[in-house]
Design a protein with these regions (language model features):
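A charge-rich, low-complexity, intrinsically flexible signal that marks solvent-exposed coils, linkers
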Residues: 1-104
């Protein structure tokens, strides 16, 4: 195998590892985000765990974060919570940074 092939394989492995790490970080972010939203919605005990699962599943529907934003925004609206889309997006960013620290 040539050094070019070795280098190519190394880059492919790094890319795969980076993608796996991003997936794990987003999973942790979604858990933190789900806990925050559940608290704001007044969920208790098992309702919190169930809601976290709903949030995690919502993120798997479409690429990007808008599916999470829409889901939580609709839930807040249904419960008459006054939390803006900007605050929701800000929390996603905050929890992403927190989750990154978990993997350092």
């Amino acid at each position: 195998m040539s050094s070019f092939d070795d280098r190519k394989k190394s880059f492919e492995n790094k890319y795969a590892n980076d993608q796996e790490l991003q997936f794990k970080i987003k999973g942790h972010r979604n858990k933190y985000f789900g806990e925050w939203a559940a608290d704001k919605l007044g969920k208790k005990d098992q309702e919190i765990e169930n809601y976290i699962d709903e949030v995690i599943k919502a993120d798997l529907k479409k690429p990007g974060d808008m599916d999470l934003v829409v889901k939580v925004q609709q839930d807040f609206k249904a419960s008459n919570s006054n939390i803006s889309e900007d605050e929701i997006k800000s929390k996603l960013d905050e929890f992403f940074e927190k989750a990154k620290v978990d993997f350092q």
